[in-house]
Amino acid sequence: MTKSLLQLIILIFFFNYSLFSQSERKFKIHTVAFYNVENLFDTINDPNKQDEKSPMMDITYNRGGVYKQKIKNMARVIADIGEDVTKKNPAIVGLSEVENKQVIIDLIKDSSLSGTDYEIIHYESPDKRGIDVAMIYNKESFKPISTKSYELLIYDDQTNKRIYTRDQLLVSGTLEDDLIHVIVNHWPSRSGGEARSISKRESAARLNKKIIDSLHSLDKNARIITMGDFNDNPMNNSIKGILGAKKNKEDVKIKEMYNPMEKILTNEGIGSNSYRDVWFLFDQVIISKGLLGNDFSSYKFYKAGVFNKPYLTQKEGRYKGQPFRSFSYSKFTNGYSDHYPSFIYLIKEMK
C-alpha cells in the first residue's frame, strides 16, 4: 500500500467519524405540563368553602371509592404525559381545580406517580368555589428558590362587588442549574357569556403581564413559562394583545412571549376543551424569548402539544368525541377531565 493511499484511507475514516459524532448529539429532555384536573375535591364538607357545590358532594353512594378512583385516574394521565418520548414522568406540572393541599398529597402518592420524588407548591386562594392552582415538581430535577401567590382583584361590572377568584402562582427555581420561572394560572371563566366576562380575563392578563415584566426587568433573557387554563383562546386579546404572545418564533423579540399553542389550534385544529361541538384551546403553555434559540447549552424549547390519547376521549353519548369528563349529571363517569393537558418539552445538550 502506498503512503498516499494510506493517508487517504485515514482521512476518509476521520471525516466519517466526525460526521457520525456530530449526528450523535445527545440531549437531556424534560416534560413541563399543565392539567385542569376537573374538580379534584376531597369527600369532606369544608364549612369555610362552597365545596358543597362540587360534583364530589353530589355523590351520595361510595363517595370514598369515587374519590380514590378519581385520584388514580388523574395520576395515570399525569404519568403518561410525554412518557413516550422522555421515558419518565414530567419534571413540572401545573394544576388547576384542586381543592386543597391534601388532594395533591393523595395524588402524588398514587402508584403511577410515587416512583417520582414529587413535591408540592400550593397556596389557598380566595376563590368562591374553593378551587386553587398548584404545582408539583420532581425534586431531583427542579429546585425551587422562591414562591409567591399573586391575588387577582376584580369586580362585577354591574354590581361593583368583588369577585373572588384564583390567585396566580409564581415559582422560581433551577432546572438542573438553569434558572426558570413558572407561573400557574386559572383565569376567570366565561360564566355569563364571553362578552360579559372578558374584562375579568383581561384583568388577569394584566396581572400576568406585570409579573412577566418584573422578571424581565431583572433579566431580559429570563426563562419564563406561564401556563394554565386561561379560559381564552390564543387569539383572544387577553393573550394576543395584553400578553403580546406571538404565533411565530421568528417574530419574538427580547422580553416578549411565544405561544406555540396558537399554531396547534389554528393550523392543526386541535383543542384542549370543547363546548357545543366547538373546540377551544384554553389550556396553554406560553414561553419567553429566553427559552428559544439553538444554543442548547441551557434548556430550550423543543416542542409543544396537547395530550389527547384515545382513552381520554368520550366514546359515546352526549359528549362523544370530547374530553372524557369525570362527572356528568351528578354522577361519576370513571372518566378523567373535561380538559386535555397541554405540555412542552425542554431539551439541553449533554456534555
Regions found by a protein language model. Give the residues of each.
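Metal-dependent phosphoester-hydrolase catalytic domains
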Residues: Q22, S214-I224, D232-K351
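Extracytoplasmic, non-cytosolic globular domains
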Residues: H122, L169, G173-I264
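Structural recognition of the beta-strand scaffold that forms the well-ordered cores
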Residues: T31-F34, A91-S96, E119-H122, A134-Y137, ...
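Bacterial Sec-dependent N-terminal signal peptides
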Residues: M1-F27
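Extracytoplasmic/secreted cell-surface and envelope-processing proteins
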Residues: D42, Q102-I105, R129-D132, S191-E194, ...
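N-terminal, active-site-proximal structural segment of metallo-dependent hydrolase catalytic domains
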Residues: L19-L113, D117, I121-V133, K309-G321, ...
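Structured beta-strand-rich core segments of catalytic domains in phosphoester-bond hydrolases
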Residues: V98-L179, N185-W187
